[in-house]
């Protein structure tokens, strides 16, 4: 946790995930009304990837924006943190 991606010469994979903006305040299903529309989100996503490539000085792997993707994750680190908010957001 004390080293940056650049110090470790690691790689970066950027995947869009609108579900991070889910609201569970009301009803039985999450609402995604706060997620940005495609015409706003896609340029932001591409801009972030470009900035990351410039900062790292190498290509950044990326997912297909808006696609249904299967992603496998292997955490290699000392901790995993789950934060449970009392506001249910």
Describe the predicted segments one by one:
Residues 58:
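Nucleotide and nucleotide-moiety/phosphate-recognizing core
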Residues 11-14, 80:
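Structural motif
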Residues 1-9, 22-34, 38-51, 55:
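Compact, glycine-rich, soluble single-domain proteins
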């Amino acid at each position: 946790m004390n080293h940056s991606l650049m110090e470790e010469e690691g790689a970066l994979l950027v995947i869009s995930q609108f579900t991070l903006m889910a609201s569970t305040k009301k009803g039985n299903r999450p609402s995604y009304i706060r997620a940005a529309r495609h015409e706003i989100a896609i340029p932001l996503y591409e801009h972030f990837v470009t900035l990351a490539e410039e900062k790292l000085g190498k290509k950044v792997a990326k997912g297909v924006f808006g696609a249904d993707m299967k992603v496998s994750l292997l955490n290699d680190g000392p901790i995993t943190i789950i934060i449970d908010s009392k506001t249910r957001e």
